Amino acid sequence: MTRGLYIESYGCQMNVYDALMMEDLLRPVGYAAVSRPEDADIILINTCHIREKASEKLYSTLGRMRVIKKEECILIVAGCVAQAEGEAVFERAPYVNVVVGPQGLHTLPELIMKVKRDKKQINIEFPVVSKFDAISIDRKANGGVSAYVSIQEGCDKFCTFCVVPYTRGPEYSRDVEAILEEVKQLTDRGTKEIVLIGQNVNAYHGTYKGNEWDLGKLIQKVSLIDGVERIRYTTSHPRDMHPSLYEAHRDEKKLAPFVHLPVQSGSDAILRKMNRKHTAEEYLRVVEQLKDSNKNMALSSDFIVGFPGETEKDFEETMKLVESVGFALSYSFKYSPRPGTPGAEYSNQVPEEEKSARLAALQGLLTKQQLQFNKSMEGRVMDVLVGDPSSMRSDRIFGKSEYTQSIHISAPSGSEDCFNRMVRVEILHGRQNSLEGTVLSNAN
């Protein structure tokens, strides 16, 4: 008899991928996804520790699930908060049955079997054998017209504001053949866009027949798989932009001319305190090389304002860098200390009102740049990836550009031919957060 599995997942692209992996892992032992926690025999909360108050969000969610779950339902906490909190989850929420960190997800079937005998199970180890090596991916969970494929996990950079090295562990690159097999499984099910993901994705150094491959070479190989029409990758670190990656952007037409390249600050003094391992000038050189590799290149980034010790001069240098690059879109946040990170122990914490004022100024500039970029799309013809019929509203369908912009497309008669494929679209209007266009023809 099939039992119900309800997964509630927060956070980054890797968590989306991990949730699909867990669904695939539990299917062979008799669990299938359900849409309501009330109907589940397992409720799994897949957590993220990047943003502020992540733990409070978890315990609030657990309290809600405790009230509505079935009496015999197994309650599981997975992900980065599980890794960081460990046994403390059981102390604050004794009704939780399983705590499992990101590197122990492949042990879920075993933990669930054990919990029926021993009530509580925990696995927050960083194993010698990676979860990528411990399981064989079988992508039964539908990835859709666009799907994530994890190629790298963990981080060795140890930025002083970041919990990732402590919750995801050291950098590990997945075997090339396993990646290619997963991409083939996805394209066989109709996926058109492959998004290669990792905490530090351009640090990828997998192996293929005894030889080491970097991300640029992997992209070239993925592009040869039948059915792949667009390739993206995220998230990148400025220190790991290798020559082969610039070459891939120059030569590989299926690779989107868009890179998410976090910089965090434009001040060298703050970049040193953050342990970012690059200067503002080095970041700008990477940007220049990317733009030289493809005339259509655009970038997005992440920024933290109010890092300990940030002066008004430091912040002005960040604004100067933003003006110099001209980002297509970006994400900006006020610094908030993460327990266990060096930054949490720094003196010279910036007052909240100063953080708020700087964030407003930075977001104002980034918003202006985003609108300018979207307006620059007017009159262009581009290939747009359109999802399934659920993306249709009245006389419009919705798609994603090669720059990840949402596009509202006037739907012609016979628009059912547009779904789950690449469509040729003329952009008529650029708005703040989206584009508007009209279908010309299918791209393929």
UniProtKB/Swiss-Prot annotation:
Domain MTTase N-terminal intervals: 3-117
Gene Ontology molecular function, alphabetical: 4 iron, 4 sulfur cluster binding; metal ion binding; N6-isopentenyladenosine methylthiotransferase activity
Documented EC number(s): 2.8.4.3
Cofactor remark from the record: Binds 2 [4Fe-4S] clusters. One cluster is coordinated with 3 cysteines and an exchangeable S-adenosyl-L-methionine.
Localization, UniProt: Cytoplasm
Chain ranges of the Radical SAM core domain: 141-374
Cofactor(s) of this protein: [4Fe-4S] cluster
Top-level EC class as recorded in UniProt: transferase
InterPro entries in the record: Elp3/MiaA/NifB-like_rSAM, Methylthiotransferase, Methylthiotransferase_CS, Methylthiotransferase_N, Methylthiotransferase_N_sf, MiaB_methiolase, rSAM, rSAM_horseshoe
Keywords, ordered alphabetically: 4Fe-4S, Cytoplasm, Iron, Iron-sulfur, Metal-binding, S-adenosyl-L-methionine, Transferase, tRNA processing
A Pfam family: UPF0004
Domain (TRAM): residue spans on this chain: 375-441
CDD domains tied to this protein: Radical_SAM (cd01335)
Keyword Iron: yes
Family assignment from sequence similarity: Belongs to the methylthiotransferase family. MiaB subfamily.
Its job: Catalyzes the methylthiolation of N6-(dimethylallyl)adenosine (i(6)A), leading to the formation of 2-methylthio-N6-(dimethylallyl)adenosine (ms(2)i(6)A) at position 37 in tRNAs that read codons beginning with uridine.
NCBIfam families attached to this UniProt entry: miaB-methiolase, MiaB/RimO family radical SAM methylthiotransferase
Protein name (record): tRNA-2-methylthio-N(6)-dimethylallyladenosine synthase
Organism annotation: Anaplasma phagocytophilum (strain HZ)
Gene coding for it: miaB
